[in-house]
Amino acid sequence: MASGQERIVVGPTGAFALTTPDPDVETAARRVGRAAGEVRGYLVAALSWAPFVDALVVVEGDGGRVETVGVVPSRLLTRMITDGPQVLGHELVDRIVAEIDQHAGRA
């Protein structure tokens, strides 16, 4: 992935690339946006279809957006990635996680 500071979370509500605002929100947003694109790219190549990978910068302050990247207060992160429509079945979540693990092993 872009720098190794990003984390990928996959579950029934989707796939998310997360990072902290290091060294600042704007730089982190660009970095996690690239990471989300990379993950989606190799998922599409491996699975012929892939979910959108939401890029998020997790902050202690207020949320918002930097270009296409969400800026999410840490206190709301759990709710954001667990609430909402279940868009991925368990089998697909397992396949996505396996592909991410395999790709991470090659990096």
Where are the regions a protein language model picked out?
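Surface-exposed interaction regions that form or flank ligand-binding interfaces
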Residues: 1-3, 12-13, 20-107
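Short beta-strand scaffold segments in enzyme catalytic cores
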Residues: 7-9
